[in-house]
Amino acid sequence: MSNRREQRQQAQQFINELAGEAYPNSTRHYESGSRDDIRVAMRLIHQHDSLVGGTEDNPILEPNPPIPVYDTSGPYGDPKENIDVHKGLSPLRKTWIEERSDTRELDGVSSSFAKERENDIFTEDFRFIRSRKPLKAKAGKNVTQLHYARQGVITPEMEYIAIRENMGRQAIKDAELTQQHKGEHFGANLPETITPEFVRQEVAAGRAIIPCNINHPELEPMIIGRNFLVKINANIGNSAVTSSIEEEVEKLVWSTRWGADTIMDLSTGRNIHETREWLLRNSPVPLGTVPIYQALEKVNGVAEDLTWEMFKDTLIEQAEQGVDYFTIHAGVLLEYVHLTAKRVTGIVSRGGSIMAKWCLSHHQQSFLYEHFNDICEICAKYDVALSLGDGLRPGSVADANDDAQFSELRTLGELTKIAWEYDVQVMIEGPGHVPMHMIKENMEEQLKHCHEAPFYTLGPLTTDIAPGYDHFTSGIGAAMIGWYGCAMLCYVTPKEHLGLPNKEDVKQGLITYKIAAHAADLAKGHPGAQIRDNAMSKARFEFRWEDQFNLALDPHTARAYHDETLPQASGKVAHFCSMCGPKFCSMKISQEVRDVAKQAENLAPAQAAEKEKEKGMKDMANAFNKSGAELYHTADSKVELP
């Protein structure tokens, strides 16, 4: 059996056996909102008690509270959920959308290409059977979250997000867990508690976006903005060479379980339309695309044959399926292409190179730029957010921060203002390959020229010499730019520059970027960001091994590494690990020092009283001797008695 066939069969088996699954010693918890249908999922990591005294037979224990953490896994993280990918997820937001009375149900799909696929008998065997018809804004209505926010309306999505961002941390009262370093936020506004009104204000100002197409009611609302938790995106999708629908659905589920806040389907192979439908109907997180990829497939890969009408049809096709944000490379202008001529690596963005080739072959301005107003009109009818693509991003550290990159960035700032005129939500995409000392300038330039719209970067990679380890090279840059104010980080997997990532590569990329995003939150001083770190440190010092595993971003790997050398059950309660052994464990020695200090502290009052008594006796003896050492003195004696 070929390796490709094996991978597909394994993915099919994964889907067939798919069930809600909790992390080790974790439970799903739902925080309620102002209405019954606002139930915000989060994960509680339960801990064991701390041993604070007593004897082996009669120990004195102190309970440790469960640690709440942000959960992107949707129903896939709840063991009580019945999951059937052939039916899709429940439409969480359906009632919220209907209550606003500003949408209408279409008779069927509007896109010419979507109609063709529906009537194609060759797609019947692998087509997702959709039960709902697409929605669209009523005439004269705008259905974007930005529009509602500017009208002063707090939507259920905004309330959901406020609860989600707070993560139930207010319930933790232990000062040892809530202590936190101040951090350096570089001008970000980080309130102690996120309120629905704060969410509304940030969206209204364009500083944050809520990607949530009206045709993707299955998603759990989330927010992207520098005044909120740093988010991460996972790229999945097939290619002309490899992957199948089953494998992409498996990657979707896998990605959400390991912490992806959004997913981008970058499929460039066969059956793109059908693959996307399966992903959307089963995605609890927002899903983005690069529509130019599919448009290029429709013209058999010949960029010169692309037209506005074909691209427009692709936008409508994807919007009616439920795509939550489009990456549009509208900033790649004809006059900027020559700026890349002297670069070491030229234009490395697929979308950027497609549009550059189109501009040169027709010697015309980009149709994405020329029709940008039309694009915004389409997005406003479905609430598709725009992710303005960095088609001229640097593909090597040698090309970082050059004229081509920053010329495009300034144009993206101009396009942002146009999109806002239509109440269309916008975020800005960034590099790329940038050495560490040049990263901060990227954030500063973006804030300056793009009016504080959220920044979304691919890394950046801080060096070019580590193929196979570019999740490391980019994780460094991601942590830095996240600290400076980047709102969302696009993961890079170990396969970057080498091949299409598999399931394990996706996990490695996500864990790396969860680390980067969390490190950025810590550095910014985001309220509550340090709670999990403090819990881990306490568990580590107390040799609560099981809690250390469970508090880790990847409990399975943490446990496996520990058990390689200490697999016995006794190893889970030992006051040492295999690194130092029982005699040289710094934590154990520190505990012994602390115990000795505590004993000395307890003895101190009694010792002090004894010393005071001894001093008093000496003082009295000195006074007696000074008075002449006589037992008795006459009544008229002038001797000063003690």
Curated annotation (Swiss-Prot):
Q: Per the record, a Pfam family?
A: ThiC_Rad_SAM
Under which EC number(s) is this enzyme classified? Answer: 4.1.99.17
Q: Where does Zn(2+) bind?
A: 433, 497
Pathways per UniProt: Cofactor biosynthesis; thiamine diphosphate biosynthesis
Q: Which GO terms describe its biological process?
A: thiamine biosynthetic process; thiamine diphosphate biosynthetic process
* Essential cofactor(s): [4Fe-4S] cluster
Gene Ontology MF annotations: 4 iron, 4 sulfur cluster binding; carbon-carbon lyase activity; zinc ion binding
Specify which residues bind [4Fe-4S] cluster according to the UniProt entry for this protein.
577, 580, 585
Q: Which UniProt keywords apply?
A: 4Fe-4S, Iron, Iron-sulfur, Lyase, Metal-binding, S-adenosyl-L-methionine, Thiamine biosynthesis, Zinc
Cofactor binding, note field: Binds 1 [4Fe-4S] cluster per subunit. The cluster is coordinated with 3 cysteines and an exchangeable S-adenosyl-L-methionine.
* Residues that bind substrate: 235, 264, 293, 329, 349-351, 390-393, 429, 456
What this protein catalyses is: 5-amino-1-(5-phospho-beta-D-ribosyl)imidazole + S-adenosyl-L-methionine = 4-amino-2-methyl-5-(phosphooxymethyl)pyrimidine + CO + 5'-deoxyadenosine + formate + L-methionine + 3 H(+)
**Key word Ubl conjugation present:** no
Q: Name one GO cellular component term.
A: cytosol
Can you tell me which residues the record assigns to a coiled coil?
none
Alphabetical list of NCBIfam families matching this protein: PRK09284.1, PRK13352.1, thiC
Similarity section: Belongs to the ThiC family.
Relate the protein's function as given in its record.
Catalyzes the synthesis of the hydroxymethylpyrimidine phosphate (HMP-P) moiety of thiamine from aminoimidazole ribotide (AIR) in a radical S-adenosyl-L-methionine (SAM)-dependent reaction.
Q: How does it assemble?
A: Homodimer.
Q: What is this protein called?
A: Phosphomethylpyrimidine synthase
Species of provenance: Alteromonas mediterranea (strain DSM 17117 / CIP 110805 / LMG 28347 / Deep ecotype)
